[in-house]
Regions:
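A short amphipathic helical element positioned immediately N-terminal to and/or at the very start
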Residues: 3-15, 203
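Hydrophobic alpha-helical transmembrane segments of multi-pass membrane transport/permease proteins
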Residues: 13-41, 49-69, 103-108, 168-171, ...
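Residue-level recognition of membrane-helix boundary sites in multi-pass small-molecule transporters
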Residues: 19-20, 93, 158, 189
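Hydrophobic alpha-helical transmembrane segments of multi-pass membrane transport proteins
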Residues: 30-31, 48-119, 165
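Transmembrane alpha-helix boundary and packing residues in multipass membrane permease domains
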Residues: 32, 36-37, 114, 118, ...
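Membrane-interfacial helix-loop-helix junctions in multi-pass membrane proteins
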Residues: 41-42, 46, 123, 174-228
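Alpha-helical transmembrane segments and their short interhelical loops
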Residues: 91, 95-168, 210-222, 226-230
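Short cytosolic juxtamembrane segments of multi-pass membrane proteins
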Residues: 236-243
Length: 243
């Protein structure tokens, strides 16, 4: 009950910044339309709409860190968390309270991307539903990674870390903009170790209906989501003990 009340409070805080939400939802659409237009003039297999849309959807999830990190950082720098520490809520309760309001935003973001791609020629099938649901582990990873940053850094710092570093990591290491095999070497090896490439491959496999391939990419993404959540809880617990 307390956790649900806290989650509702976090949802209200997120809705107080509609410009940030609009940017998170709108910027992936701008990229989708621009790259789709580029594909019509200079055909590139990587930018075909059925291949591009799953990748853009996953890239858009990186903006979830821009929602979760500043929210926690602001609470940490204010007196709010000091009051929260005096309640019976545990660290997992608090992390869930921050996490749960952002999951519907992630689902809406993915749904909007796929809906916007339909007039551009996206193949419409029930597999879109699986693709939308399949991005949830990566959404959890991005949200809890933002919470981890918010637990350790100030409001000004998380803007640079989450707004620049993490979004660029997602862009360059996911294979959305270029085929990682063309670069090869250490760069490709690093990309395959991190979750961004696997999240895009998972989304593409689900959209294509290849559930066997999807399962191979689901494991590393889920593992990273679990580790990020555990790290966020551990850091939040450390902050509670300091207070």
């Amino acid at each position: 009950m307390r956790m649900r009340a806290f989650a509702r409070r976090c949802a209200r805080e997120l809705l107080r910044d509609p410009l940030n939400l609009a940017f998170g939802l709108g910027f992936p659409l701008v990229l989708l339309f621009l790259l789709s237009a580029l594909q019509r003039n200079i055909p590139v297999p990587l930018f075909e709409i059925d291949t591009l849309t799953p990748g853009i959807t996953v890239f858009g999830l990186s903006f979830l860190t821009l929602f979760s990190a500043p929210l926690l950082a602001r609470d940490r720098e204010s007196a709010f968390l000091h009051r929260l520490y005096t309640t019976p809520m545990t660290a997992p309760d608090c992390i869930l309270g921050y996490l749960l309001p952002l999951l519907p935003i992630a689902l809406m973001q993915a749904a909007v991307c796929y809906l916007a791609a339909m007039p551009l020629g996206l193949t419409v099938s029930l597999r879109i539903l699986w693709a939308v649901l399949g991005m949830l582990p990566m959404a959890v990873f991005n949200i809890t990674l933002g919470l981890l940053c918010g637990s350790l850094l100030g409001v000004k710092q998380v803007g640079g870390i989450c707004g620049a570093l993490l979004t660029n990591l997602s862009a360059w290491l996911s294979g959305v903009w270029f085929d990682l095999e063309l670069v090869g070497g250490v760069f490709e090896a690093i990309a395959h170790v991190l979750p961004f490439y696997h999240a895009v491959a998972l989304e593409k496999a689900l959209f294509a209906g290849d559930f066997t391939l999807a399962a191979t990419h689901l494991l590393p993404v889920t593992l990273y989501a679990t580790l990020a959540t555990a790290a966020a809880v551990w850091c939040f617990l450390g902050q509670m003990k300091k207070q």
